[in-house]
A protein has these predicted regions:
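A penicillin-recognizing enzyme superfamily signal
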Residues: 1-2, 7-14, 22-24, 30-43, ...
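Short, solvent-exposed loop/turn segments at the edges of secondary structure
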Residues: 5, 51, 66, 88-92, ...
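Short active-site loop at a secondary-structure junction
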Residues: 6-8, 32-54, 67-70, 91, ...
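Active-site SXXK
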Residues: 18, 45-71, 96, 155-159, ...
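Sec-exported extracytoplasmic/periplasmic mature domains
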Residues: 18, 56-65, 76, 98-102, ...
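Short, well-structured active-site flanking segments
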Residues: 33, 37, 51, 60-77, ...
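Conserved catalytic neighborhood of penicillin-recognizing serine enzymes
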Residues: 65-118, 177-209
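Mid-domain, small-residue-enriched loop/turn segments at the edges of structured enzyme/sensor domains
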Residues: 80-82, 113-154
């Protein structure tokens, strides 16, 4: 009859059609019956660094940056601190993403402008972007209201899908009393090109390194191509992992309903463990498929 205070939520999308195939709104409460909060689409939380590929890096990859572009990881007055307190100087954009360098995300977002950067999540239906979000802190996921796991899964699935957005839904088909199909979301989906194809493929290439040598190192799936991003808020009240394979995209959030610091909460602790266990399970028996290469990939 225990009531769990530490909560979580997750959303999984089938990348072949953009449909939501699994959703978890929280930990089961035996003592509670009837309607309960579904945190996967009803709770808006700060996404931390998981927001960087959506609003900063993929947009900049459309504008001439590449994984090999050199950027300057040097602290500057008025700028953010890197999570580990260290600064690496001249580094590649790939390395900056793998190590989740806040300084680089902040600089590139200012260069891009918040108006341009935030136009991307808005195109993908992020419902709670407000006027007060149009500041550099948004580059690090510092948003007024936050995001849901459904929104984040849809955005990362868009990157996997060569930049083409499909509105997330759990409804695959609706038929009437006579069996006539009224809605068929498997075959007739409205699509929107949000990111340029090559930029999305470059982003996927970079995010593969996160699981090999970055903030989620050592957690790549066995015998399956995968890419992803960790996210942790500065006060450790929200932890995320957003990742995908050519088959599925899954996002996981962990935290308290009433935000509270959790000393050992990082994107690469509880959220990543949940993501890896779930993704390993649903990929059993599936053949490894490589991600598509970007133009100029070595």
């Amino acid at each position: 009859d225990k009531v769990y205070k530490l909560q979580g939520a997750a959303t999984c999308i089938d990348n072949s059609n953009g449909l939501i195939v699994a959703i978890v709104g929280g930990r089961k409460q035996k003592s509670i019956t009837g309607y309960t909060l579904n945190r996967a689409y009803q709770s808006y939380r700060q996404p931390g660094s998981c927001f960087k590929p959506i609003a900063v890096y993929t947009p900049q990859l459309e504008r001439g940056y590449t994984p090999d572009s050199i950027v300057d990881d040097t602290y500057f007055n008025g700028g953010p601190h890197n999570a580990d307190g260290s600064y690496a100087g001249k580094i590649s954009l790939r390395y900056a993403v793998e190590k989740s360098k806040n300084v680089i995300a902040w600089k590139l977002f200012q260069e891009l402008t918040p108006e341009v950067g935030l136009s991307y999540p808005i195109k993908m239906g992020f419902a709670n972007i407000t006027d007060s979000d149009y500041y550099p802190a948004a580059s690090l996921g510092g948003l007024t209201n936050g995001v849901t796991t459904v929104e984040m899964a849809s955005a990362f699935a868009t990157i996997e899908n060569d930049g083409v957005f499909r509105e997330p839904t759990c409804i695959s088909k609706i038929t009437d009393a006579d069996g006539k199909t009224i809605v068929n979301n498997k075959n007739n989906r409205r699509e929107k090109q949000v990111y340029k194809k090559n930029a999305a493929r470059m982003m996927t290439s970079i995010l593969q390194g996160v699981l090999v040598s970055g903030t989620a190192r050592g957690n790549a799936l066995d015998n399956m191509s995968c890419a992803g991003k960790t996210g942790t808020t500065s006060d450790k009240k929200d932890g995320w992992f957003c990742g995908y394979t050519p088959y599925y995209t899954t996002t996981v959030w962990v935290g308290y309903d009433n935000p509270k610091t959790i000393s050992d909460l990082y994107g690469n602790t509880y959220p990543l463990r949940i993501w890896r266990e779930f993704m390993s399970d649903i990929h059993q028996g599936l053949k490894n498929v490589e991600f598509k290469s970007y133009d100029g990939e070595k």
